[in-house]
Curated annotation (Swiss-Prot):
Keywords: Carbohydrate metabolism, Glycogen biosynthesis, Glycogen metabolism, Glycosyltransferase, Transferase. The gene is glgB. The active site is at D404, E457. This is 1,4-alpha-glucan branching enzyme GlgB. It catalyses: Transfers a segment of a (1->4)-alpha-D-glucan chain to a primary hydroxy group in a similar glucan chain. Monomer. CDD domains: AmyAc_Glg_BE, E_set_GBE_prok_N. The lineage of its organism: Bacteria, Pseudomonadati, Pseudomonadota, Alphaproteobacteria, Sphingomonadales. It comes from Novosphingobium aromaticivorans (strain ATCC 700278 / DSM 12444 / CCUG 56034 / CIP 105152 / NBRC 16084 / F199). GO terms for molecular function: 1,4-alpha-glucan branching enzyme activity; cation binding; hydrolase activity, hydrolyzing O-glycosyl compounds.
């Protein structure tokens, strides 16, 4: 039956909502026939993919529409076209059947599909005898979706997609295109308006900014050599392992030149040996996903599944992770499921409606960052995010995710005034949809990737952030492995900024943290957030003249490495960078020529080595049994001392003298009589100190030892018997 003229016009204009109903091979009253749009052709002959001639087509419309009878059943066809003495072949995408199946439809609709990154987006596959790319995108409210790219001159009329109405997914298999092809989606909204071209939410690769197209790409192909590393972390309890995290912005750790970026392979050659020599156990990268704006540091991503093109092809990141693992170093990435930017090529009003976000700005707009908040009440949005967490664990072997801005997800009134937010169904401020999403994400990654860990950046007193989220657990439990201890960071930095003479009045800024230190599995974070936006570097937060600043910083690091909790330090602070961090420039590595800065670097290196080699300092980081106060109330002298311990391990005493006053004969309570070896002293000359100490050891008798306490210093004493 010949379609009406209006349908043909719509087809040729690229506005027909169901091009598969008209194009390809169809059964007619006189047998099978083929219909194709072949712009520029004068003649066309249909062939099977196996090389069998099926029939000749005639041009029935001057705009390039061909029709003709063909032999055989419905099957993929290839057209041999001629015009002006030229010949070319076109494999007809509309002659192929769908790639997604009923099971995909069911799982996508249910929100339980845990392999979406194999199905959605662009995938190079072989389908019904042809090689090409399968495209699939979720746009349930769109009137029409087309793939446009450098393979079809960005012409929306060439490849309109098939709609799977039950799930709102549009798909098409386009034969004879390969990898590294730029593409976007042209979406016509429900109101008939044409939206800005959209990047693929599931794209595996993207163009280098300022270009914004997605790129067709194979999944990373790696001959992984990290089995031993992964087996180790799968077999242990991370809470009882040493974890010292070096937080890195990959674009500014070092730079090849002012405007450029090192590739992942170049970073691997430089960063991995440095981290290993420094004794850090983990590297945590600020977000590595594609993002358009450098000053966002990656936290406003438009390509959650695509490693940023700034650092070379995606395979380079996989090689970096593999190399780190072979060196015994774990790799964490910052992950941003809380919000996304308003760039027009991104997720904003993706199909002409508030699809990934909320329609109401009181729910869907983030006032702090001028970004949009994911709608965690939509199962498709939750699936998109949960699958992304699984994707990084599976495809790139990352060891964990540091989840950004969790507090902003948990509360509907976060950073909002009265009248700017909507209570939940119970009248409260909790965002229970976000809670359920975080639980689902943690269950998914912990359930399928042994040894994986998640860390929450959560700045409130929400209970149970790092408590299990199994069925029957308290509703508030989120299921994270760890939580950042923001209280420790705020209180201790406030204390260290005070003049030593005033610290006696603020003793609780150090002691109070132990009231809650074991309520969660904590990471102690000295992160990038503390050295930007006018806050100054950690060195410049310390009180006193230059000598005292360095002494204070060494003492502070000693306190932190001796304190219960895993450790995190932002790049540059391990050698006391003086300037604030900026993503636009490399760290000031030349500072290491100065003895004071090199001394700090050695101190951090040795802290890491002692921390990792002494179970007393890490095996009970998250349990109160691993901590005992020795001196808690000497506010007048601003001295603190505690014992770190673990079953079967030699205990370690940590002593902090937070004034410049030297104490030559300080009575230190110790639980075991005998020799205690001075394993670390921040005032040692090797670290830039004055060299005051205890000549390597002290002896405890009748429950105490008399020790020498250097000025503005931290000591660690290990019991030897």
């Amino acid at each position: 039956m010949k379609p009406p003229a209006s349908a043909i016009d719509a087809l040729l204009d690229g506005t027909h909502a169901d091009p598969f109903s008209l194009l390809g091979i169809h059964e007619g009253p006189d047998g099978a026939f083929a219909r194709a749009v072949l712009p520029g052709a004068e003649e066309a002959v249909a062939w099977s993919l196996s090389g069998k001639k099926l029939g000749k087509l005639s041009r029935v419309d001057g705009r390039g529409l061909f029709e003709g009878k063909v032999k055989g059943p419905r099957q993929p066809v290839r057209y041999a076209c001629k015009a002006d003495g030229h010949e070319w072949l076109v494999t007809d995408p509309y002659s192929f059947g769908p790639v997604l199946g009923p099971l995909d439809d069911f799982l996508i609709a249910e929100g339980t599909h845990l392999r979406l990154f194999d199905k959605m987006g662009a995938h190079l596959i072989e389908h019904e005898g042809a090689r090409g790319v399968h495209f699939a995108v979720w746009a349930p409210n769109a009137r029409l979706v087309s793939v446009v790219g450098d393979f079809n001159d960005w012409d929306h009329r060439r490849h309109p997609m098939r709609r799977r109405a039950d799930i709102g997914v549009w798909e098409i298999f386009i034969p004879d295109i390969g990898e590294h092809r730029a593409y976007k989606y042209r979406i016509v909204g429900h109101d008939g308006g044409v939206l800005p071209l959209k990047a693929d939410p599931y794209a595996l690769a993207a163009e280098f900014r300022p270009s914004t197209a997605s790129l067709t790409a194979h999944p990373v192909k790696m001959d992984w050599a990290d089995a031993a590393h992964r087996a180790h972390w799968a077999s242990v309890d991370a809470r009882r392992e040493p974890m010292s995290i070096y937080e890195v912005h990959p674009g500014s750790w070092q730079k090849p030149h002012e405007e450029g970026f090192h590739t992942w392979d170049e970073l691997a050659d430089r960063l991995i040996p440095y981290v290993a020599e420094m004794g850090f156990t983990h590297i945590e990268f600020l977000p590595v996903s594609e993002h358009p704006y450098d000053p966002s540091w990656g936290y406003q991503t438009t390509g959650l599944y695509a490693p940023s093109a700034r650092f070379g092809p995606p395979e380079g990141f996989a090689r970096f992770v593999d190399g780190a693992h072979r060196a015994g170093i774990s790799v964490l990435i910052d992950w941003v499921p809380a919000h996304f930017p308003t760039d027009e090529h991104g997720l904003v009003r993706f199909d002409g409606t508030a699809l990934y976000e909320h329609e109401d700005p009181r729910l869907g707009f983030h006032p702090d960052w001028n970004t949009l908040i994911y709608n965690f009440g939509r199962r498709e949005v939750v699936s998109f995010l949960v699958n992304n967490a699984l994707f990084w664990a599976e495809r790139y072997h990352v060891d964990g995710l540091r989840v950004d801005a969790v507090a902003s997800m948990l509360y509907r009134d976060y950073s909002r005034k009265a009248g700017e937010w909507i209570p939940n169904a119970e009248g409260g401020r909790e965002n229970w949809e976000a809670v359920e999403f975080l639980k689902a994400m943690n269950r998914a990654v912990y359930g399928s990737h042994a040894g994986f860990l998640t860390i929450a950046e959560e700045s409130t007193a929400w209970p149970g952030v790092s408590k299990p989220a199994f069925d029957g657990a308290p509703r508030e439990n989120l299921g994270f492995g760890f939580k950042w201890n923001m209280g420790f960071m705020h209180d201790t930095l406030k204390y260290m900024a005070r003049e030593p003479i005033h610290r006696r009045y603020h003793h609780d800024e150090i002691t109070f943290g132990l009231m809650y230190a074991f309520s969660e599995n904590f990471v102690l974070p000295l992160s990038h957030d503390e050295v930007v936006h006018g806050k100054g570097s950690l060195l410049n937060k310390m009180s006193g003249d230059d000598w005292q600043k360095f002494a204070n910083l060494r003492a502070y690091y000693g306190l932190m490495w001796g304190y219960p909790g895993k450790k995190l330090l932002f790049m540059g602070q391990e050698f006391a960078q003086r300037r604030e961090w900026s993503e636009a420039r490399a760290l000031d590595w030349d500072l290491l020529q100065a003895p004071a800065h090199e001394g700090i670097r050695r101190w951090v290196r040795d802290l890491n080595r002692v921390y990792a080699s002494r179970p007393a300092l890490h095996a009970r980081d998250c349990e109160p049994e691993g901590f005992e106060w020795l001196v808690v109330d000497d506010a007048e002298a601003s001295i603190f001392a505690w014992l770190r311990k673990a079953p079967g391990a030699r205990p370690v005493a940590v002593i902090c003298n937070m004034t410049p006053q030297v104490h030559d004969h300080y009575r230190l309570p110790l639980p075991l009589d005998g020799e205690w070896r001075e394993v670390l002293n921040s005032d040692a000359e090797d670290y830039g100190g004055s060299g005051i100490g205890n000549l390597g050891k002290v002896t405890a008798e009748q429950g105490a030892a008399f020790v020498v306490l250097p000025p503005l210093a931290t000591l660690m004493l290990e019991f030897e018997g």
